C-alpha cells in the first residue's frame, strides 16, 4: 500500500456562488485514491455534489494532489447504534454520552450554545473543554478534516462482520470520527448532518467508540453540527495540522476487535 502513489481528492459544492463570496454550503467530500482510479473517484464526488438533498449547486470545486507523506493506518472505532424515539431523546442521550467521555456538564451546556454557529460551516468548531470557548479562530469556515479514506474491499469485510449496510454515509462518518479520535487532543466529537433528509448523528471518542444515535434532529431541518471537544492545553497548531494534512487509511482487522 505504501509503495503505491496515492492522491488526496477533495470536493466542495455551494449555491449562490462559492463559499468565499458567501455561497450556501451544500456538500463536500474527501477521498484517497491511486492515479489509475482517479476518474472513478472524481466522478463519484461529482455525482455526490450534484445530486444533493440541500439543493443544486452553481459552484463546485474538485481538486487533487499527490501525497508525499507516509499514510497512517488506523483501526476503525467500535460502533454501537442507539435507537431513540425522538430527536429530543436523542439529544438527551448525546449529552449523557459526552459526560461519559469525560466532559463536564457545564462545558457541554456551553458547547450547545455554540451550535447555531455550526449552521453553514464547511468544517468543525474546536471547543476547549477547559475554557468553554471556541478556539479555532476560523469563523464561518471551521476546521475541515481532510486526507482520509477506507479502501472499499476492507470496508466491505467490516460491514459483513458487523452486519451493517454498505452505506457511504456510515463509511464517511466513521472514517472522519476515527481519524479525529485518534489524536490525543480530541476528547470527543458531537455530529449530525445538515442534510434535511438525514437525521442520524453520533458521539464519538477513543474511549466510547462511535456511538450512533438514530434521531438527533427532525426531518426537513438543514441545521447541522460538528463540534470537536479538545484539550486546549495541547498545541493547537499541531492538532489542526494533523486534522487537515495527515493522510489516514482506515484498516479493519478482525483480531483487533477481539
Swiss-Prot record:
Please tell me which top-level EC class this enzyme sits in: ligase
Q: Which UniProt keywords apply?
A: ATP-binding, Biotin biosynthesis, Ligase, Magnesium, Nucleotide-binding
* Keyword Acetylation in record: no
Please give the superkingdom of this protein's source: Bacteria
State which pathway it belongs to. Answer: Metabolic intermediate metabolism; pimeloyl-CoA biosynthesis; pimeloyl-CoA from pimelate: step 1/1
Q: What is its EC number?
A: 6.2.1.14
GO-annotated molecular function? 6-carboxyhexanoate-CoA ligase activity; ATP binding; magnesium ion binding
Example GO biological process: biotin biosynthetic process
- Give the required cofactors: Mg(2+)
Q: What is the disulfide pattern of this chain?
A: none
Catalytic activity, as annotated: heptanedioate + ATP + CoA = 6-carboxyhexanoyl-CoA + AMP + diphosphate
Q: How does it assemble?
A: Homodimer.
* Physiological role: Catalyzes the transformation of pimelate into pimeloyl-CoA with concomitant hydrolysis of ATP to AMP.
| Family to which the UniProt record says this protein belongs | Belongs to the BioW family.
Q: What is the protein's name according to its record?
A: 6-carboxyhexanoate--CoA ligase
